[in-house]
């Protein structure tokens, strides 16, 4: 079995680390008004396809599907969350729909603080996130706003990464209970605050405390996919990746196995 397992792997036991999604952010100069006031001042125009706020909605012709409408609660037993206005959007924010390379991004702007969030960024160099923020600022510069709008900074808010077992056979799986046990036994680069045992033999999850108040979660799946979720820097992800890569390379005979060929 050991020889068969060895034959199922390439020279590198795992693939390289890849970013698969990021919430990018930034800060612009304060607009000196609230979201309630700003939505009344803004006049929809390119490059913004739609504007949504709890106190108003606008869109360009042909983009009516981007307008948010109130949703009925599906769970009548759950206490409804506190909302403002029509409750369609994130409180205190204006959401702008902006295109970049055929992908629609939903930017959130908090006018009173100047904070910006762009979920769904997929370019490793964050080109799409930066472009969306720049388009938003250019849009604001042509609006009837007293304050001159400028970009103060760009920043990453949350980055998710992935890699996987570098196997040539779909029959290779991770023994999740043994993997979880190793996480409890081996010194880790960051303190582990929580390890969730395998749920229905599908994955094991652990949380690393990478800095005071900041946790990064890993999900290790049965068939070899591994996610590193909620990083705010690439460096913390690379540190966790290096640790997991070494763990797999050293202990692969314990934690990896090959399913028998089906009859």
Swiss-Prot record:
Induction: Expressed in the early phase of the viral replicative cycle.
UniProt keyword terms in alphabetical order: Early protein
Domain of life: Viruses
Known function: Putative TATA-binding protein.
Family listed: Belongs to the asfivirus B263R family.
Domain-related comment: Possibly contains a TATA-binding domain.
Protein name stated in the entry: Putative TATA-binding protein pB263R
Organism: African swine fever virus (isolate Pig/Kenya/KEN-50/1950) (ASFV)
